[in-house]
């Protein structure tokens, strides 16, 4: 998925609108987007909307933390909606395989699991989490990660100017962990949704680090994510040239002054895989 739109589960208007937008996936959020007193109503709203939805998009629910009594109520909702409608469940603040296994034992339906890396310990355990056969992807949570490590910022998910690039390190570590086990890796949202230049830069950085897509918190962020994470025609042509040249050789080959080896070949194949995903 290139773009993953996060939608508060308590807004009928936002839920209905999300079905008409261009994101590859929608996450209906029962966790941070909904205050405690509003979670009962949010579950009722979301259940009604999902059961009546005709959307062909990949639909997901982000549940509350497993230590919260709200999580069991979220599971009741998941059971009533069912796996025919839900594509995946988003698990927040997972920091150990034991915590992941707790969730798996409780889940009433068999759906894909996407794990959020939002704490220092979660980052350290990212490879073990990615290795789990039930996990489809890892997603970075910049705001909670900053809180976890005591990183100050002027706004959610945004370090101080003196540490402007600091979050690239944990994001890259998470991407490495995910890709080491053949799983997808997603960057978290850019919170300044009216700052198109900042969003474009953040998305380009995530792509350059190897992320497969990015979360969005506002409709105007979707096209940026889709455009940046969709390989250009020039990139596709170059990848096809690399593959063709390598297949005609018995090893490393010179392509227009550039030495092409096995690593270059794997990068080319991965780009074409991303192209195929974006066209589905």
Residue ranges and their predicted role:
Residues 1-280:
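Expand to "…catalyze enediolate/carbanion chemistry for C-C bond making/breaking, isomerization
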